[in-house]
From Swiss-Prot:
The active site is at 90 (proton donor). CDD domains: Lumazine_synthase-I. One of its GO terms (biological process) is riboflavin biosynthetic process. Keywords: Riboflavin biosynthesis, Transferase. 5-amino-6-(D-ribitylamino)uracil binds at residues 24, 58-60, 82-84, 115. It catalyses: (2S)-2-hydroxy-3-oxobutyl phosphate + 5-amino-6-(D-ribitylamino)uracil = 6,7-dimethyl-8-(1-D-ribityl)lumazine + phosphate + 2 H2O + H(+). GO terms for molecular function: 6,7-dimethyl-8-ribityllumazine synthase activity. It comes from Cupriavidus pinatubonensis (strain JMP 134 / LMG 1197). This is 6,7-dimethyl-8-ribityllumazine synthase. The gene is ribH. Pfam families: DMRL_synthase (PF00885). Catalyzes the formation of 6,7-dimethyl-8-ribityllumazine by condensation of 5-amino-6-(D-ribitylamino)uracil with 3,4-dihydroxy-2-butanone 4-phosphate. This is the penultimate step in the biosynthesis of riboflavin. It is an enzyme of class 2 (transferase). Its EC number is 2.5.1.78.
Amino acid sequence: MDHGFYPSNLDGEGLRIGIVQARFNEPVCAELLEACVAELEKLGVEGEDTLVVTVPGALEVPLALQKMAESGQFDALVALGAVVRGETYHFELVSNESGAGITRVGLDFNMPVANGILTVDTDEQAHARTREKGRDCARAAVEMANLVVALDSLRDQEDEEDEDDDE
């Protein structure tokens, strides 16, 4: 049996990326953003094709992502933030609800959303993960934007073939 294979495509040229950065735990979030934007540039995403908006915290990220997705101006989105465990249940609430909201935006709008909301026990853990997570999110956004385009083109080809069969 023959199988097709679509290799990962990390060419960011021409892609438009929206980034929502939470400001809570600002030093960590600034490092996440710096790493993400630097990696997007390395992948060929132009600065003018990237829009960064900030929100107060992780729970506000999904709404900003939703508004960006509704605009139709982006090929992929990135969520950046940090939730550090405290002494109350709030950590679980913020982690779970922000994650669910981020996932819902991607599925509701058929748009790649890279989740870079760190959920960690300590500030030290957060700082140790910022560079890698920021880069990973940039790469995931570009790869998934290209994959969605490729898969949509398969559907479009199938639709054209169906139209040809109807004639």
